[in-house]
Each structure stands twice: as structure tokens, then as C-alpha cells.
Amino acid sequence: MKKVLLSVCLFAMTGAAQAADIVRHSNGTNFPIARVVEVPAGKTIYFHSGMTPAPADPKATPGTPEYWGDTKTQALSTFARIKESLDTMKLDFGNVAAMTVYLVGDPAKGGRMDFDGMMAAYSQFFGTKEQPNLPARSTVQVAGLVGPGMLVEIEVQLAK
């Protein structure tokens, strides 16, 4: 009986340790980002380098909109590449605590960043029924990225 009681107590303590997990504080709106993400002591923090998209059409002329695609296409590709990278480390989008999205102004949008296109891609990976965890996130427009015609680079920080 003592062994059973000890096992139950140890199991309960394990559950309590699991409860001391990452806390995501809502921003108080329906917008799918966290206001603050709190990472308790004892968690491992990962700083992932920025990722850019793969060419949408490698047969097109490099640097053209056809080669890279629009902002939504590039963001989808970038998120897919991040997912592949995270998979190799046994991490996933649920571990993302913070994100910075760099968008180049789209010539087809008068030089303004296509925030809606990026959000259409982002919303497929974050705040879904399958993956409800939301990161703290900033999105900024930049003058350019490393590859001519690239419109998207995304950097994530994770905790597990």
C-alpha cells in the first residue's frame, strides 16, 4: 500500500512540475499573438537563425516575382522550412515563444509590406485548433533581404 501511495504522490508531483510550463499572456484581443510569453527557470531556450523562402518556381528568372512568389507564398515556404528545421531538433511551432517577421515592401503593393499576405500564412500554423500556442511577435518592414526579390525572413526563439 505504501508503494502505491508513493507512486501516486510521485505522479502528482510530476504533474505539478509539468504545470510550471511556458505561460502565454493574451493581448486581450482576437489578434493571434501573445502580449507576453513567460518562460520559467529550467526550460531550454533556443535562438533560431532567420529563415528565408525556397524559390516558388526555380525555373523562373532568379530575383523575379515569379521566382520567389508573393508575400503569402514566401511566408508559407519560410514557415515550412522552419518546421523542417525544428523537426530535426524535436521541436515544433508549439515551442515558439517569440518571433520577428521581416517583410520587404512588395512592389505590387506600392512598396508597402503585405501584412495580410503574411498573416494568411501565419494563421495556418499559429492559433489553430491543432496548434493553439501563440508567440510574442513583431513584424517590421525592411528595405531589403539577402536575395533580390525576397520579401520574407522569419526568426524564432523557442523554449522547451
Regions found by a protein language model. Name each.
Residues 3-9, 13-80, 84-97, 106-160:
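N-terminal presequence-like segments and the immediate start of the first folded domain
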